[in-house]
Amino acid sequence: MKVTKADIVISAVKPEQYPDSDLPEIALAGRSNVGKSSFINKILNRKKLVRISSKPGKTQTLNFFLINEMMHFVDVPGYGYAKVSKSERAAWGKMIETYFTTRKQLDAAVLVVDLRHQPTSDDVMMYDFLKHYEIPTIIIATKADKIPKGKWQKHLKVVKETLAVEIGDEIVLFSSETGLGKEEAWKAIHKMTKTKNA
């Protein structure tokens, strides 16, 4: 899809701060430093729309981005960062659960995992959480450029089996460096949101 407009609308922590809009929403989740910000910047053709932090666990709000006036991307704070305090982790959990369980505009989630490594227990927990609430999920297996092409299928199998990916949920091979998987990611997003691939 050709992205002509992408703007941050609001950074929210509670429902009354969410945008008052009927547009479909896609939530983007992933472990801290997995490459989620790079994924968002790449598929939106923006270099610095989402700041890429060298400090894991930096995003502590739900960041709503308006894309082409037709949908919202919701950047969810990264999980699994050990140095976050228990109280911060509890606040994160409550904020995420509130959004995922109450937001009617939410059509699907994107879960970003690192293709090079077996998904962590936190990745499994996040996927199970999404499935518990019956949220359709697209899995983005990023950093594919760091692995020889001949080993992609082997690594994909590990991702699929570790997460126990349900039928209907797509896995997209992706690279923020080369742009691999960009079109496939958009196709999956349009399918989930029933928007047109303009």
UniProtKB/Swiss-Prot annotation:
Cofactor: Mg(2+)
GO molecular function, one term: metal ion binding
GO cellular component: cytosol
Domain EngB-type G: 22-195
A Pfam family of this chain: MMR_HSR1
Database matches in InterPro entries: G_ENGB_dom, GTP-bd, GTP-bd_ribosome_bio_YsxC, P-loop_NTPase
Keywords: Cell cycle, Cell division, GTP-binding, Magnesium, Metal-binding, Nucleotide-binding, Septation
Domain of life, source organism: Bacteria
Residues binding GTP: 30-37, 57-61, 75-78, 142-145, 174-176
Binding-site residues, Mg(2+): 37, 59
GO biological process: division septum assembly
Keyword Membrane found: no
Role of this protein: Necessary for normal cell division and for the maintenance of normal septation.
Listed name of the protein: Probable GTP-binding protein EngB
Organism phylogeny: Bacteria, Bacillati, Bacillota, Bacilli, Bacillales
